Amino acid sequence: MTIGSKFSLLAGTRKTDGPTEISASSPPDVETPSAEKTATASAGNKEVGINDNSSDEALPSQHVQTGVQKIQAVTLVWSKWSLVAVFCLLWLVTLANGFRQSILYSLTPYATSSFQSHSLLTVINIVSSAMVSALYIPVAKVVDVWGRAEGWLVMVGLSTLGLIMMAASKNLETYCAADVFYSVGFAGMNYILCVLAADITNLRNRGIAFAFTSSPYMITAFAGSKAAEKFLVNVNWRWGFGAFAIIFPFVASPVYFVLKVGLNRAEKQGIIQPRLRSGRTLSQNFKYYFFAFDIPGVILLAGGLTVFLLPFTLATRAPNGWKSDYIIAMIVTGFVVMVLFVLYQAYWAPQPFLKYEFLTNRTVLGACLIDATYQMSYYCWNSYFNSFLQVVCNLPVAEAGYVGSTFQVVSGVLLFMVGFAIRKTGYFRWLLFIGVPLYIFAQGLMIHFRQPNQYIGYIVMCEIFISIGGSIFVLLQQLAVLVAVDHQYVAAALAVLFISGGIGGAVGNAISGAIWTNTFLPALMRNLPESAKANAVAIYGDLRVQLSYPVNSPERIAIQESYGYAQARMLAAGTGLMALMFIWMFMVKNYNVKNMSQTKGMVF
């Protein structure tokens, strides 16, 4: 993958294939597409849905990565029905993924509780988020160096392996290791799905395409929660994971075969040449891919982020709290390793992942900061939300899942509206001026309503408002990074965005874990009746123990009050962080996507 030279800070240096610049004749803060994009779009401006650009250029772009050439070759040879088939397959994958998310979201607290580790939910999330964030680097390079199909197949394999390991895990250590494979696999699949959506759509229609592939979540939000309850009642949580280890490979594999069939057809027609053997030996191949996939960068980022963030959750368990030697050592070591990652990318990496153009483009930076802040704020309070609904609101598993899935239902409808609004107006930044204030308002309201004895309808109302704002963020931040780069950098730009979100999620989980461990257990010790205080640690670590106390019993009321005390502080932290959005949203330039196109061939 040609990812660019090391960071250049020389005055006046700018690569010609980087992000577009504002034209001198353009209105203030309105982005004009580059000459290359305008030329590509000249025939595409007439599109009204599926658009055939193959007459513009009959061959894939030259001087781009192999993976980009492959997908352009596929779109140049396939028919309208092949395009429709891919969209349908991606819809089915999203449907299965939605069921997986909805079911396992409800089962995860019971899985960790079976190891008496319910309070370690955030620790597991921190480790998996850090690993996922780092591994977007090699995944982006795999889809650019090898191809989209090959990257998809690898991610399907990793996610299936993770599900099998989780279903068979007998202790927390195995479960945590499985969660890394599971999280990396499914995060990688979601990432490649976004890359594929960018490959087969025009910028003008990308919002509609994103809405279509996200629409299955409206179905799975309710059906999945009920299925999770049935797993717990009739079988066990392990079969919830095991079932998807069987289902998912069958649903996801056809995407790989459709892409490979299209590539074979392109090779037979001479549109792209088959890949020749490199002639490298096994050891030379290992060395080449070790640096091409930036494995040193992965190790530095994942290790540094994990070691730095874990102490914020583990400090209360340490013998001397924050004064413990290993807690201080972890924070210092993690920080130093993350600094080394930045220096490595800047000066020593043979093929650096972080491009200079990305780091100096205000739209890319703004979108990444929006995603990081949104994820940080969201994960400040979300990890224990499902448990809160069951323990404090006294909802059964299915109904708690319904409330927790509000985002999926709302986004399924709202994304279509946002997508059509962008197609009609050509602009998207104005939507941030609606989403940001609404999200902060709703999350602020939730501080008041996330307490015992509150009507559940108020919580659902806040969730709906939060979902409206969140849906806008999810779509616009992707669109913002894509309009700022050419097609050959789509995978890399999206990876930078996903890394930002992953780091934000890891930091949010660290904040959540720190607040939880420093508030919930002390609150239990204050609120529990004397007869139950000896059981405080068991209550703290096991959701099933919390639910075992009858509703309205002194013990249950004490647990509910402790939840309310902790949750209010989690939400306050998340709401305070969201204030940064008022700065980040002004960093995004006001692009007009009506006259922009990055793709070739038969696209939507």
From Swiss-Prot:
Region: Disordered, residue numbers: 1-61
Concerning InterPro entries, the annotation shows:
MFS (IPR011701), MFS_dom (IPR020846), MFS_trans_sf (IPR036259)
Membrane-spanning intervals of the chain: 73-95, 115-137, 149-168, 178-200, 207-224, 237-259, 289-311, 326-343, 363-385, 400-422, 427-449, 454-476, 489-511, 566-588
Q: Which terms are listed as keywords in the entry?
A: Ion transport, Iron, Iron transport, Membrane, Transmembrane, Transmembrane helix, Transport
What membrane topology was assigned to this protein in its record? Multi-pass membrane protein
PROSITE patterns recorded for this chain?
MFS
- GO biological process assignments: cellular response to iron ion starvation; ferric triacetylfusarinine C import into cell; transmembrane transport
Instruction: Cite the Pfam families for this sequence.
Output: MFS_1
What would you give as a GO molecular function for this chain, any one?
transmembrane transporter activity
According to its UniProt record, where is this protein mainly located? membrane
Sorted alphabetically, the Gene Ontology cellular component annotations on this record are:
plasma membrane
Places the protein is found: Membrane
Q: Which family does it belong to?
A: Belongs to the major facilitator superfamily.
For this protein, the record's PANTHER family field holds: MAJOR FACILITATOR SUPERFAMILY, MFS SIDEROCHROME IRON TRANSPORTER MIRB (AFU_ORTHOLOGUE AFUA_3G03640)-RELATED
Q: Write out the function statement from the record.
A: Involved in the transport of siderophore triacestylfusarinine C and so has a role in iron homeostasis.
Q: What is this protein called?
A: Siderophore iron transporter mirB
Q: Which organism is it from?
A: Emericella nidulans (strain FGSC A4 / ATCC 38163 / CBS 112.46 / NRRL 194 / M139)
